[in-house]
């Protein structure tokens, strides 16, 4: 009896590939899983960018305060809704080589608009994080501001103003910097306290 034909048939049936319908079912399942997962992944990415921007802004203010206390000269952080953040430090009278000026530059006796009296030591534009929006509210007025100058003295005190034409005045209320995206429930707050300390809160 010749059994070669059935054996060959069984081998051929066992080694066959996927049918077109089976491949289409697999593709549909993968597409459904991707559709379910993508919104969650996108939300996580937005949250991560928001957190990173908020932490970097808070660190910028902390470093500015420490720089003022360490150098013995005033340091100002300027926020502008268009250009972002700039950190400026005062220069000693006579330039960088003068280590002992008669009157150390401070928040109030420095003309921050004159390049010869200041220099930019750091910049940060939140726009590098896709979709991140920044807003500033000063207390106790609660008014939104498109510009904010916050100056730290060598003793760590903080002076602020929201208009460049105004005089810098001692901080008496909280400054709230909102960092978020155009998505509900996705926002972080950078709070700068009257003592100059900065912290991040939900």
Question: What name fits each language-model region?
Answer:
Residues 2-10, 21-24, 32, 36-62, ...:
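N-terminal helix-rich module
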């Amino acid at each position: 009896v010749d059994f070669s034909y059935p054996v060959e048939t069984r081998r051929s049936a066992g080694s066959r590939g996927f049918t077109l319908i089976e491949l289409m079912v697999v593709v549909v399942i993968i597409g459904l899983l991707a559709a379910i997962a993508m919104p969650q992944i996108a939300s996580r990415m937005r949250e991560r960018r928001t957190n990173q921007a908020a932490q970097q802004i808070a660190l910028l203010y902390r470093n500015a305060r420490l720089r003022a206390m360490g150098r013995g000269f005033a340091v100002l952080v300027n926020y502008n809704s268009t250009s972002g953040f700039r950190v400026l430090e005062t220069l000693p009278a006579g330039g960088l080589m003068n280590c002992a000026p008669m009157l150390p530059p401070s928040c109030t006796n420095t003309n921050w608009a004159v390049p010869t009296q200041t220099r930019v030591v750091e910049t940060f534009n939140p726009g590098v994080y896709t979709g991140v929006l920044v807003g500033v509210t000063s207390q106790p007025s609660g008014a939104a501001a498109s510009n904010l100058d916050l100056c730290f003295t060598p003793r760590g005190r903080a002076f602020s103003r929201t208009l460049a034409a105004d005089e810098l005045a001692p901080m008496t209320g909280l400054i709230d910097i909102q960092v978020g995206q155009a998505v509900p429930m996705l926002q972080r707050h950078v709070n700068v306290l009257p003592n100059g300390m900065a912290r991040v809160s939900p």
